[in-house]
């Protein structure tokens, strides 16, 4: 029977071999080989071992490849010729290398660690030391934090001293003393002399009458009797009535008018002057005037018109001014005064002791430069040539800000003064009625050239409504109306003409209600529409542009190139907006 060559992938070393496609050979034989693990048929028909490095066959026997340092001893055991040596703290046993350790080193969870006790601790895988004031760590060194008078000098803790404390040559802290203080007994003491003494460790003062110590304040004072007192810590004589002291502290008799001291004869005498006479007795000398001695020997007074003698409730007589209160006069305390009625008042004095009478004015009135009372005019009111109050005086129109109806070139669209802007703002209560148109006189818009399809103009105002110099409109052509021209003097306030900040907030972004969008016509031709966009308080300003408080911008846009070679001139457009008040 011819055996089939087995497939290498399905090798079965048990004989007889099965064919790849036929049925198994019957009867089955049970050879001593039952597993292909470790065996192979190589060459074909020969059973051999399947080997891998370092196993080989040598002289028909299984052998082991050995590299440098390996050999077999006489008993056939595999040995190593390289002997490992160690040094402390490493220790070699029969089959291991160990690390010899002692405290504070220990092995925890198969890792070498350091056992630490306070103040040492392990934090962040680092052995560190806990410290408490005054100990501290500075520049990675343990140090002591000091505060005066303690300090560190030359690496040593030292004490800073100042007089009277000092240190001796033996580095001993001591105190220096000057008389009456002494340290002769080894302690700080005082040298005493009568009447100062010590008792129970306290200083005392020996004293006798009239000196005594008060019970409440323990203060040494002087006991005083009648006629003597203590004034401002000084002992002095008590005086009353006409007795007093002169500038040198001498006691003296104080005298008033009619009396004087005769210092030569040291006597008190009667001293009188006119109209008194004291030759022998005191008399009153009377001259010409209202004073006289009446029949009862009393001093009396003569009086005439405008004066009268008033008898008081106690029957005393008083001379008073006889005035008529019905004629605008009155008494103000003790003075005659004008009884000012409604419409009159006293103004602030312009000079000392003056308080002029003036007219009291209310709303709608004021004083002019000539101190005359005139009506106070508000916006829109003025005087005409006859001096009457009028509304909307064309020669002094404070209700209209404009550029005049036929201005010279006054603004820039692309270049300086390349266009004429006609802008009229008329105040109508809380609304501003406005009219705008523009005419290009030179540049790329006169006529329209190239791809130009828009024109823009921005006017900016400060917080007082005054036109800023960085506007596209020249301030020289912008003022209140005066006839068909403008005022000759620049205005200083026109806030009432500005767009309302609450209705049109000042922002860099345009809001819907801040824009007025409509259509005008080029040269008034209805077949040539131009879109006009008016933006209130919405202009964008860069860092090099003076910020504005209020603003208006005008943009004219058209599509296509149908307007090339046309002069840019728009029809007038009228609009309104809410005014700032």
Swiss-Prot record:
Pfam families: Adeno_knob (PF00541), Adeno_shaft (PF00608)
Keywords noted in UniProt: Capsid protein, Host nucleus, Host-virus interaction, Late protein, Repeat, Viral attachment to host adhesion receptor, Viral attachment to host cell, Virion, Virus entry into host cell
Record region (Spacer): 393-398
GO terms of biological process kind: adhesion receptor-mediated virion attachment to host cell; cell adhesion; symbiont entry into host cell
Entries under SUPFAM superfamilies matching the protein: Fibre shaft of virus attachment proteins, Virus attachment protein globular domain
First and last residues of every Shaft repeat: 45-59, 60-75, 76-95, 96-109, 110-124, 125-139, 140-154, 155-170, 171-185, 186-200, 201-217, 218-232, 233-248, 249-265, 266-279, 280-296, 297-316, 317-333, 334-354, 355-370, 371-386, 387-392
Region (Head): 399-581
Keyword 4Fe-4S listed: no
Function according to Swiss-Prot or TrEMBL: Forms spikes that protrude from each vertex of the icosahedral capsid. Interacts with host coxsackievirus and adenovirus receptor CXADR located at the cell tight junctions to provide virion initial attachment to target cell. The fiber protein binds to CXADR with a higher affinity than CXADR binds to itself, thereby blocking the cell-cell adhesion function of CXADR dimers and leading to local disruption of the tight junction. Fiber protein present on neo-synthesized particles may thus disrupt the junctional integrity in order to facilitate further neighboring cells infection.
Protein name as annotated: Fiber protein
Organism: Human adenovirus C serotype 5
Taxonomic classification: Viruses, Varidnaviria, Bamfordvirae, Preplasmiviricota, Tectiliviricetes
């Amino acid at each position: 029977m011819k055996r089939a060559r087995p497939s290498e992938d399905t090798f079965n070393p048990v004989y007889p071999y099965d064919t790849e496609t036929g049925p198994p050979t019957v009867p089955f034989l049970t050879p001593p080989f039952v597993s292909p693990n470790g065996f192979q048929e190589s060459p074909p028909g020969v059973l051999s071992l399947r080997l891998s490095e370092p196993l080989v066959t040598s002289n028909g026997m299984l052998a082991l490849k050995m590299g440098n340092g390996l050999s077999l001893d006489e008993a056939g055991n595999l040995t190593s010729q390289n002997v490992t040596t160690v040094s402390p703290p490493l220790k070699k046993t029969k089959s291991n290398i160990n690390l010899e350790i002692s405290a504070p080193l220990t092995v925890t969870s198969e890792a070498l660690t350091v056992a630490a006790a306070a103040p040492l601790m392990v934090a962040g895988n680092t052995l560190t030391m806990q410290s408490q004031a005054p100990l501290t760590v500075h520049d990675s060194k343990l140090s002591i934090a000091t505060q005066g008078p303690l300090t560190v000098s030359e690496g040593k803790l030292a004490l800073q001293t100042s007089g009277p404390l000092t240190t001796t040559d033996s580095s001993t802290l001591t105190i220096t003393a000057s008389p009456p203080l002494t340290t002769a007994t080894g302690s700080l003491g005082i040298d005493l002399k009568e009447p100062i003494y010590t008792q129970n460790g306290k200083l005392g003062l020996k004293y006798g009458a009239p000196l005594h110590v008060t019970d409440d304040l323990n203060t040494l004072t002087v006991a005083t009797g009648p006629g003597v007192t203590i004034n401002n810590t000084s002992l002095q004589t008590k005086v009353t009535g006409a007795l007093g002291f002169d500038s040198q502290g001498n006691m003296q008799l104080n005298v008033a008018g009619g009396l004087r001291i005769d210092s030569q004869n040291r006597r008190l005498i009667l001293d009188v002057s006119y109209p008194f006479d004291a030759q022998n007795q005191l008399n009153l000398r009377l001259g010409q005037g209202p004073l006289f001695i009446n029949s009862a020997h009393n001093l009396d007074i003569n009086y005439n018109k405008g004066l009268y003698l008033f008898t008081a409730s106690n029957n005393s007589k008083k001379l008073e001014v006889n005035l008529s209160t019905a004629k605008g006069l009155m008494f103000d305390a003790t003075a005659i005064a004008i009884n000012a009625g409604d419409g009159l008042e006293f103004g602030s004095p312009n000079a000392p002791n003056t308080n002029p009478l003036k007219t009291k004015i209310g709303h709608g009135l004021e004083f002019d430069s000539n101190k005359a009372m005139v009506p106070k005019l508000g916006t829109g009111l003025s005087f005409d040539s006859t001096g009457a109050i009028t509304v909307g005086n064309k020669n002094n129109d404070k209700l209209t800000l404009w550029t005049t109806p036929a201005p010279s070139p006054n603004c820039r669209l692309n270049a300086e003064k390349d266009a004429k802007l006609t802008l009229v703002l008329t105040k109508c209560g809380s609304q501003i009625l406005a009219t705008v148109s523009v005419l290009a006189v030179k540049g790329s818009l006169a006529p329209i050239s190239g791809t130009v399809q828009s024109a823009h103009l921005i006017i900016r105002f400060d917080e007082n409504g005054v036109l800023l110099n960085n506007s596209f409109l020249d301030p020289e052509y912008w003022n209140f109306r005066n006839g068909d021209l403008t005022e000759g003097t620049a205005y200083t306030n026109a806030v009432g003409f500005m767009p309302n900040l609450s209705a049109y907030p000042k922002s860099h972004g345009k809001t819907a209600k801040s824009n007025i969008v409509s259509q005008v016509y080029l040269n008034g031709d209805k077949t040539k529409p131009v879109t006009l966009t008016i933006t209130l308080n919405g202009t964008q300003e860069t860092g090099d542009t003076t910020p504005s408080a209020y603003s208006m911008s005008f943009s004219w846009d058209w599509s296509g190139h149908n307007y090339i070679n046309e002069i840019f001139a728009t029809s007038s457009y009228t609009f309104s907006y809410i005014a700032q008040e």
